[in-house]
Amino acid sequence: LSEATSVAVNSVDEIIVYNRGTKPIIIFDKEGNYLRSWEENTFSNAHGISVDNSDNIYCVDSGDNTVRKFDPSGNLIFQLGKEGERSEKMSGLPFAVPTQVAVDESTNDFYVADGYSNAKVHKYDENGKYLFSWGESGTGEGQFNIVHNISTDSEGLVYVADRENHRVQIFDQEGKYINQWINLSRAACIYVDKRGKEDIFYVGEYFSGIASNDTGTDLGPRISIFNKSGKLLSRLGKESYGPSVGRFYSPHGIC
């Protein structure tokens, strides 16, 4: 692995790693044993990977401004965006350095977080037909400052990691603002565990990025765990960044 930017798990518990390296998509079993890899020389800058109920794989390339959907065998189903063509910064048009896809399991519609040079979430149907978008630059409700990651819960609600606003915003399926979780440190990724009676939410937080806080504690990088009402249940990673067990550098993807 070079930079493992995102990770997903399919229905047979295979771990799919999106890697910035010679082998961009690497698949392991649940014990970490290498199984296979594919799509060499396809991606410019791997950023976010997601899997739907049929084990189709969505790969977001922030370098060439594309979203690609593959079947479980790695065959391309469709591509959104054209390599080398980026929408004008903050134009609101897809795509301007997109980051992640989230699939609504109840409808198979999906959402694209867009991203570094836009302040939008775009919604598409399962065939890649554009439906609508929402969001704008800012710090208010429904506004974004780097739409860095996105996920959905068992009811189809949409959770957006609004990284530089240090929060997670929650929307319904029509893009209507519902709520937000604050007191986060650069919320970079979010995973919703839907296997139990109640959804559990894992939020990866970056280090604050301020040199004077290099030795600070409980500022990130860390993983915060919430219930559906936004109650903090636990946190992993109390110390500053580092290689030892229980510490992180930059939690960029969770599954």
Q: How would you describe each model-predicted region?
A:
Residues 1-255:
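Eukaryotic scaffold repeat domains enriched in small/polar residues
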